[in-house]
Every structure is written in C-alpha cells, then in structure tokens.
Amino acid sequence: MEADNTTETDWLNITYITMEAAIGLCAVVGNMLVIWVVKLNPTLRTTTVYFIVSLALADIAVGVLVIPLAIAVSLQVKMHFYACLFMSCVLLIFTHASIMSLLAIAVHRYLRVKLTVRYRTVTTQRRIWLFLGLCWLVSFLVGLTPMFGWNRKATLASSQNSSTLLCHFRSVVSLDYMVFFSFITWILVPLVVMCIIYLDIFYIIRNKLSQNLTGFRETRAFYGREFKTAKSLFLVLFLFALCWLPLSIINFVSYFDVKIPDVAMCLGILLSHANSMMNPIVYACKIKKFKETYFLILRAVRLCQTSDSLDSNMEQTTE
C-alpha cells in the first residue's frame, strides 16, 4: 500500500514538473513575442502598451523565475528556513506584479474615456513611469512581507530545534498572510475594483455611442475603438480571475483545516501559472495590430527558414 502511494506521488510530481516546464516555455516565448511586436510596430507604442509590456515582463518572470522555483519547492529540498521563505516570496512578487499591472491598465483606460479632452495633459509619460514604478514597488513590498516577520518561523521553532527544513511553500508562509493579506487585500479587492472600473467604462462608451453624434464621425470611431480595446483588456482580466481564484479559494478553504488533495493543489498551481501564457493569445485574437505584426514575424521566420534551406541545397549541389 505504501509502495502504491509512493508510485502515485512520483507520477504526480513527474506530470506536474512536465506541465510546469511546458507552461514556462510557452509563457516566455509568447510574452517575448509581445515585446518584440511592440518594438517592431511603432503604431503600437501608445501609453496603454507600456502597461501591457509591464504585464508581459511579469509573465516572463513567471516562466524564468517563478516556475523553476515552484518546481524546486515542490521537490521539498532540505534548506535553511529563510532560503525557502525567500524562494516562496519570489513566487508571490510576480503574482502581485500581474494584478497591479492589470489595475494600472484599467485605471488608464478609464482616464482615456472619462477625460477625453484633458487625457494627454493628465497621463504624461513621466506620470506613467511613476505609476508603473509604484505598481512594481507595491508588488515587491506585498510579496516580501513574510520576510519581515509574517511567517511560520515561530511555529516551527516550537516544534523543531533545527533551522533547516524540507522546503515547502506552506511550511514557511503563514496562511493568515495568504488569505487575509495576499488574497483578500491584494487580489480580491483589486479584482472587484477593476470590474467596477470596466463596468463604468462600458457604461460611458455606451452612453456616448447612443447619443446623436451625426457629423461627429471621428468621435464615434474613437469610442468604437475604445469599446473594442476595453473588451479585449477585460478578457485579459477575466482570464486572470479564472486562473487565480481556484488556487486562492483552495488556500482560503485550507485556512479552516480542510484537507485538500495533492492533485487539486497541483491543478490550482498549474492553472495560476498557465495564465502567464494566455495574454499573448488574447492579443493575437483580439487586437488587430498585434495580429498583423504576429503574422509579419511568422512570415519573416518562414522566409528565413526557406532561405537557409535553399542556401544549404545550393551548397550541396555545388559540392
């Protein structure tokens, strides 16, 4: 019976690690493509794209840092308490960087439709950089809070003398912190605020489009574009909520000493990380300029491959 449990655990770990690696690769490639698209297409270099790039950087960090660390933590390697805690905090930083970038995007789109006349004077480039810097600062402070004392060090000290342990997220991070501070304060509340902002955006746009704007074709076109952009960005927000809420609910339920199956926990973690590879797909499907530039890049890559193939064939023929 014990051997069966060990085999089952091994298969779960192998499946989890394989899927994490695939998600990480897709997240890095997809979001690097987003940044490449912005670099190649000057028409995409709008103020909103600064925030989209910030979100892409957070998602790249998930693929490069968070997923490898999550795999290391899942293997329960023996290490010092604070080394394990720091690794766990890094996982949290980029979660909050994503949510703060989404909040920044929502606020920016709201200002765009609400302050149409004063928009350019209010949203200067300097203010946008300051806002982005504030978002990342908050993300680091919230994510690193357990390092300043809100952790399970005292609980573990009373039950074991050694400062080393088998590293596991829940062994070092307090569920009080996860549920009340990380989830409710810095994930759930921003999600509710963003939903209210987007509802107001759609309400403003609908009112403007329903008004008799005959002779104001440019104004109608502006609000039509804003409506399409808002729908696309709201889909990004919806996917974030869909991917992160299951894991947050699992943590919330665990707070009341309910036993969660390992499979459910792994699925929750995988789903949360999978969100990092979804945004490039949304941009490709929903934002025309992104889609067009994606196709240009793919065409250029195919032409390069064809050219390389022709060169190698020519060399073989010459020989």
Curated annotation (Swiss-Prot):
A lipid is attached at C304 (S-palmitoyl cysteine). CDD domains: 7tmA_Adenosine_R_A3 (cd15070). It comes from the Eukaryota. One of its GO terms (biological process) is G protein-coupled adenosine receptor signaling pathway. Disulfide bonds join C84-C167. InterPro entries: Adeno_A3_rcpt (IPR000466), Adenosn_rcpt (IPR001634), GPCR_Rhodpsn (IPR000276), GPCR_Rhodpsn_7TM (IPR017452). Glycans are attached at N5, N13, N161. Keywords: Cell membrane, Disulfide bond, G-protein coupled receptor, Glycoprotein, Lipoprotein, Membrane, Palmitate, Phosphoprotein, Receptor, Transducer, Transmembrane, Transmembrane helix. Receptor for adenosine. The activity of this receptor is mediated by G proteins which inhibits adenylyl cyclase. Belongs to the G-protein coupled receptor 1 family. This is Adenosine receptor A3. It comes from Mus musculus (Mouse). The lineage of its organism: Eukaryota, Metazoa, Chordata, Craniata, Vertebrata.
